[in-house]
Amino acid sequence: MKKKILLTIAMCLILSMGMTACGSKEKSTAVQSTNKVISVTPTDGYVAKPQEGYEQIMIFPKDKQDDNNTEYIQIDAVDPDGALNSLVGFTVKGYKQGTTNYTMDQLNADLDAKASEEKASGVVGTFDNKTSVKLGEVDYIKFDLTRNGVDANEYYGVVDGTPVYITVVGLIDKDGVSGMLNSIEYKIKK
């Protein structure tokens, strides 16, 4: 009888400690860009900051949010008026501001043209290793490269006829990054 009582008490303690531990974890909430075009849910240990005035979210490790150019994630989309305000604007020259009819074929052609342009100017390797990946609901063209002296990935995609862009610098193999990338959602106004 004593064994049953002790076993029951031990089970109750284990159950209550488990429930307390589960209940104390705070769930991350999605962060949205200026005009709510981009939404991403940062994982534990990361902070997401919308960039004021345009559709971009920057994500940093919590302990490296200031003056950090070697560990970050940058997510870009077009503004509601169709303007591109990021690096993707220099790469996707076939996109016409304010339109929503850009395609993956056009994106591939723009990326191939950018690779040719860079090779002609002596830059080698940036757009040479193109692979297709899916993050969340979006198909992307991914490149492995070096940015600011560290390994990086660039992702170019098309959502609702507009280009989107993600760069992951220095965090490509870190815990939680994959979950954040798969949590990205876009709401492009047509």
What is the role of each PLM region?
Residues 134-190:
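Short, well-structured beta-strand
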Residues 7-14, 128, 152, 156, ...:
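Hydrophobic alpha-helical context, especially transmembrane and signal-peptide helices
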Residues 6-10, 16-66, 168-190:
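N-terminal targeting sequences that direct proteins away from the cytosol to non-cytosolic compartments
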Residues 11, 96, 166:
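Generic anion/oxyanion-binding catalytic loop in active/binding sites
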Residues 41-45, 62-65, 81, 136-138, ...:
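Short, solvent-exposed coil/turn segments at beta-strand boundaries
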Residues 1-5:
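Bacterial Sec-dependent N-terminal signal peptides
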Residues 32-33, 125, 155:
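Generic hydrophobic alpha-helical membrane-segment signal
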